[in-house]
Amino acid sequence: MRIHILGICGTFMGGLAMLARSLGHEVTGSDANVYPPMSTLLEKQGISLIQGYDASQLEPQPDLVIVGNAMTRGNPCVEAVLERNIPYMSGPQWLHDFVLRDRWVVAVAGTHGKTTTAGMATWILEACGYKPGFVIGGVPGNFDVSARLGDSPFFVIEADEYDCAFFDKRSKFVHYCPRTLILNNLEFDHADIFDDLKAIQKQFHHLVRIVPGQGRIILPENDINLKQTLAMGCWSEQELVGEQGHWQAKKLNADASEWEVLLDGEKVGEVKWGLVGEHNMHNGLMAIAAARHVGVLPADAANALGTFINARRRLELRGEAHGVTVYDDFAHHPTAILATLAALRGKVGGTARILAVLEPRSNTMKMGICKDDLAPSLGRADEVFLLQPQHIPWQVAEVADACIQPVHWSADVDVLADMVVKAAQPGDHILVMSNGGFGGIHQKLLDGLAKKAAAAE
């Protein structure tokens, strides 16, 4: 079959392209911006890429067009597909029909921690000999791709609540038929497509409805939003994680890089790993619980996590200059910002200075939905630097006014980087947070710090 993918360079659609190629299909694709690393990865697999959406790319006519969720009516390729009656479907629908239908699917859903937890579950199964397939929204550190078919019935997927395509506005995860479902947490997010929390809970309940009776749902025992969702009806086994749940994690040191795994009060494993933070400990416990449903002993799962490497942009060390370390994180919601700062604070100790540098870039952030929660979420930073995005209906100065520590802001990335470099002292830690590239600020900071160090000599 010849498959053409519209919007191929996103992590999810690029992953589907690799799966389709592994199944023996001829695969081509296009995107508005064809760029590395995804373009390099796809071309290595023998997938031809086209820049832009000129309708001529659909000649000769493909057997199937997979339509990415960024495609809209008016796109020349979309219009040609509809006009010529070319068979088409969404990425999640294709994934269900051609990959997931006959697999034991382990799905990881929730507002935060999906990529990390899915990566952990995948690595546990891989390290324990299960050879799983996977599709993850980032490249897990233990692998060099974001998707593969695998060589067993087991398949791990990051189950995203974003919509499927212009013709299917349901959440992607309703297509994923999980037998093991992790529900990490649930908050209001994606304000560009959801009106309120209830709208998101409705989609999550669609997911809960399709877990079989012999399947298992793993969730935190203290998440009221998830409890409300399951109260709408649940027909599967549940395992609760947390203080009053079946599973607990017990920290053995301040930064949570060592912790015990407890099941019904009994110690069943111990994790010593390179990650820090209670949020990662929570993610790891979820992955261990899911792996047990598949058949992995908790002790073996805990040992496997000892060699887990997280995806990029999860408290990733980008470099050091002038005695200052620069970290990068994908955090783009107040809860994630709070957790990431707490993790870094646990790692560096209570007296080291942390400079938090934030770009409010997600659609929810830009709309100002959670702006009132930003100042409290930044509380563990000693100094805060905010980028003012253009064309948004609020000012980051409002957040600055609500912060208790010194805050600086600018609408220019270069100016903001200079402010951070000027404030940074040897021994400080800079944490950059954004779900985008932030104008290359990480390298600007490292270059500026190196110049500052040279000038001081």
Describe these PLM feature segments.
Residues E260, H279-N280:
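C-terminal accessory "lid"/substrate-recognition subdomains
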Residues M1-V34, M38, E43-L49, Q61, ...:
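ATP-dependent carboxylate-amine ligase
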Residues L19-L23, E43, Q57-P60, N69, ...:
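Phosphate-binding loop of NTP-binding sites
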Residues K251-K267:
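Acidic-glycine-rich active-site phosphate/pyrophosphate-binding loop
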Residues I50-Y53, G91-H96, F134-G138, G233-A254, ...:
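Beta-strand->loop->alpha-helix junctions that form or flank phosphate-binding loops
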Residues S30, G52, G91, V135, ...:
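Generic beta-sheet signal
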Residues A32-Y35, Y53-A55, M71-R73, E221-N225, ...:
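Short, polar loop motifs at secondary-structure junctions
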